[in-house]
Amino acid sequence: MEQYLVNTAKKPCAVNFIITTDGSQVPVYIVGYDPINPNTLYFRSRFRITGTEEVTMRCPQSPRMLKIIVWSEGNLPYRLSSVKLLPLNALKSQEPVVMFVEKFSRQAGRLWPGNYTADNVPFTIQYKRNIYTDTGKDHPTPARIHTELPIIQVSKSKFNQMTIPERVIILLHEVAHNFINYDQDSEKESDHNGLNIYNQLGYPKIEAINAFADIMQ
């Protein structure tokens, strides 16, 4: 396991890694997080590396200092020859809804359960310890939007385990249902509309895939 502390200065950036393995499809894990604030992961992904490959993790948001941990599955041999901080030219949205989603996603790990609002944002986030079904069981979804009221319920217990990009795509998906879609009930349309904004903001595609895969499980 290798650890690094990178001065990202709260600016958009990308972190580039050059990784070499002796074997084929060696699973290598890369995690970046805020060492000061709890439950604040900026990225967390697994890559299957063969030979020498470059991996770049995009961070439209970053902490003052980013702690990075890299390791391989089963302690298989690998070499990390470069960790480089790069500028990230991504869209910085001034749209209140998107700014609210990004800020909440960044701070969710340390926020208490409660109601959260923002100026010029047409909905409230109800941050709950857990979301329950009508029968009182733990709901599998990390967030859901009310079909009639401007409320998005978010599970703190599930958001605490998610990366910031995963939180962003989940919230954008829910926002799309009521405020972007032509068909409010269409999951496919919400996926498309949420991903369109997410990609414009510059977040890693692999984190969106991870978020949807976790929900499907």
Task: Cite the ranges covered by each PLM segment.
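Active-site scaffold of zinc-dependent metalloenzymes
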Residues: Q126-I164, V175-N181
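Long, well-structured alpha-helical subdomains associated
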Residues: L201-Q217
